[in-house]
Amino acid sequence: MTAMTIIQDWNPEDRGFWDRSGHAVARRNLWLSIPALALAFAVWMLWSVVVVHLPAAGFRYSTNQLFWLTALPALCGATLRIFYAFAVPMIGGRRFTTLATASLLLPAVGIGLAVQDPNTPFEWMVVLALLCGLGGGNFAGSMANISFFFPSSRQGTALGLN
């Protein structure tokens, strides 16, 4: 398959198809998905680490505000999972993985810039925390994408690695 090939017919349950070409395509997609999902998880959980150090860096947020910054990525990620699960069939797995992974740059770079100034408004931090939820939403899309490629007898291993 070339880089621009669109899968027209995929039947991983057909042993002949799986042995001929299916396993190679599935394996390639899995190994590309694993680092993308690791990055998504890192961005999603970033606030759990950042919040602990904000007071020492001079940020004067209340305890309540710090808890909100920690909770918002999970709330946003849980909501986005609904939409991301349907995105893969609509736009394609390769395009989804590329766009979803690229979208993680915005919160990652944003946090890197925001934590340099203790006068960063709390509202900006809330926006960045919500954007980190993109990482959580990536999980649903990634699982839907990878499970499509493997026969049911191998989906558990693939999803576990992913």
Explain the meaning of each model-derived region.
Residues R28-Y61:
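Extracytoplasmic
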Residues Y61-T70, P121, M125:
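Juxtamembrane helix-start elements in MFS-like secondary transporters
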Residues T63-N64, S152-N162:
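Loop-to-transmembrane helix entry/capping segments in MFS-fold secondary transporters
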Residues W68-F86:
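Central cavity-lining transmembrane alpha-helices of secondary-active solute carriers
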Residues P89-T101:
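Cytoplasmic membrane-interface "Motif A"-like loop-to-helix N-cap segments
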Residues A102-N119:
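C-terminal ends and interior cores of transmembrane alpha-helices
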Residues P107, P121-G137:
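Hydrophobic core of transmembrane alpha-helices in multi-pass small-molecule transporters
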Residues G137-P151, L159:
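Intracellular juxtamembrane helix-capping segments at the cytosolic ends
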